[in-house]
Amino acid sequence: MLGRSLREVSAALKQGQITPTELCQKCLSLIKKTKFLNAYITVSEEVALKQAEESEKRYKNGQSLGDLDGIPIAVKDNFSTSGIETTCASNMLKGYIPPYNATVVQKLLDQGALLMGKTNLDEFAMGSGSTDGVFGPVKNPWSYSKQYREKRKQNPHSENEDSDWLITGGSSGGSAAAVSAFTCYAALGSDTGGSTRNPAAHCGLVGFKPSYGLVSRHGLIPLVNSMDVPGILTRCVDDAAIVLGALAGPDPRDSTTVHEPINKPFMLPSLADVSKLCIGIPKEYLVPELSSEVQSLWSKAADLFESEGAKVIEVSLPHTSYSIVCYHVLCTSEVASNMARFDGLQYGHRCDIDVSTEAMYAATRREGFNDVVRGRILSGNFFLLKENYENYFVKAQKVRRLIANDFVNAFNSGVDVLLTPTTLSEAVPYLEFIKEDNRTRSAQDDIFTQAVNMAGLPAVSIPVALSNQGLPIGLQFIGRAFCDQQLLTVAKWFEKQVQFPVIQLQELMDDCSAVLENEKLASVSLKQ
């Protein structure tokens, strides 16, 4: 049951094949078994079981709230959850319990979803590996998959299997690991420059970033207000569409959401005709750093559309080379502004120094933020200095408009959907990932994803195939603004063609037992 899709489990609940409480208990048991993945910061066991009990009563009375009623979900720990600690994986917010739910969280709960817990991330969502949070790094479930382990055994130069685990990508790595390890059926991430799509690609999942303004940001602790979007992580496209149907729509608490009513639910056709589509391949995305395997799969995907009668053309996004630098300036500038609220006065951490208000501010922020966050604040403040404002921030805003116009021009030329890589390569081992600093890694990992956020477009990463190492590789589809349903329809067709092999639940469980046993043995040897 845990290996099924959200839609399948929803049908099973409606048919009485399993109860919400039984399903909840299965997921909670698996969360405990896979604790070593470090996917969750907080497990809301009591809350979930109470919600399951209420869901069970509704099913017995024939009053189901819909497809999400009784479905276990997880939420990234930068979304406010009433009565449940919300930390952003930072010392600054340790112990902070919000008095309200983020709009997207409330919408899921209103549909009867069961909140299993809050998932791990890079501190304040600043990173691309889920390695920089105060609660420690997240381990990719594929590190313990049969596919990856068998490939590693064939490599005589492989290092110790237990220490050479893989990153999930980030910053929504905890949400990706939670779904990939079958502890829930869907999870909320956030996506500012690729933070939902990147871990989806590394964990073999569907990672969907909606159009900016389609889904409310109220209650999402902000990183970059003009780019942040709640993201959705699921095991298949249909499931992402179900969750989107619950989340999309106007919100009076978020002035950036569209005011027009949204056509819901987002039903995707079982059979789609792609023969009339025009697929665009951005030539600027063929970068030297792109791995040969990803490049090959990208080319095969284009051929697949062509073989079905679709028109595949090369397009140009001429300002792509400026996008990473532009993104860095705008991102850090907004970070500097947003992080100013954490001053030790209203909520969150406060230091013991009381010599002066200024000294208290400085010490609080020094103790509360890690080096990555402080570094981005410093960069942003530099760009916002009076003497730098015009040369950096204003110029970056102008370049952002040029980047957005590149996409508009591509779509106006007749292109329906753009097809690109999501990441440069498959997931890398943690020990290799941390050889480079956060800033360098983020610039590399966001290369194909951040421009979409600056343009406000919908995008989805779809798992395509396993690499020669037995690891997932994803490709990205980018659509026109507010054509999210069309984008997901194309993605569903593609998903059906590639038939991506998921991790088998039993294989993961066997490895969980082995890892837990190794940890116990290590603990015993340390005590001796």
UniProtKB/Swiss-Prot annotation:
Listed GO biological process terms: glutaminyl-tRNAGln biosynthesis via transamidation; mitochondrial translation; regulation of protein stability
Enzyme class: ligase
GO CC annotation terms, alphabetical: glutamyl-tRNA(Gln) amidotransferase complex; mitochondrion
Keywords, sorted A to Z: ATP-binding, Disease variant, Ligase, Mitochondrion, Nucleotide-binding, Primary mitochondrial disease, Protein biosynthesis
InterPro entries: Amidase, Amidase_dom, AS_sf, GatA
Compartmental location: Mitochondrion
Catalytic activity of the protein: L-glutamyl-tRNA(Gln) + L-glutamine + ATP + H2O = L-glutaminyl-tRNA(Gln) + L-glutamate + ADP + phosphate + H(+)
Protein name per UniProt: Glutamyl-tRNA(Gln) amidotransferase subunit A, mitochondrial
Pathological condition linked to this protein in its record: Combined oxidative phosphorylation deficiency 40: An autosomal recessive mitochondrial disorder characterized by prenatal or infantile onset, fetal hydrops, severe hypertrophic cardiomyopathy, poor growth, sensorineural hearing loss, hepatic dysfunction, lactic acidosis, and decreased activities of mitochondrial respiratory complexes I, III, IV, and V. The disorder is lethal, with death occurring in infancy.
Quaternary structure annotation from Swiss-Prot or TrEMBL: Subunit of the heterotrimeric GatCAB amidotransferase (AdT) complex, composed of A (QRSL1), B (GATB) and C (GATC) subunits.
GO molecular function, one term: glutaminyl-tRNA synthase (glutamine-hydrolyzing) activity
Effect on the protein upon substituting G133V: In COXPD40; highly decreased glutaminyl-tRNAGln biosynthesis via transamidation
Catalytic residue positions: K76, S171, S195
Gene: QRSL1
Organism: Homo sapiens (Human)
Job description of the protein: Allows the formation of correctly charged Gln-tRNA(Gln) through the transamidation of misacylated Glu-tRNA(Gln) in the mitochondria. The reaction takes place in the presence of glutamine and ATP through an activated gamma-phospho-Glu-tRNA(Gln).
Family classification: Belongs to the amidase family. GatA subfamily.
Keyword field contains Mitochondrion: yes
Keyword ATP-binding recorded: yes
Broad class of the protein's primary localization: mitochondrion
The EC number(s) this enzyme carries: 6.3.5.7
Annotated spans, Disordered: 148-167
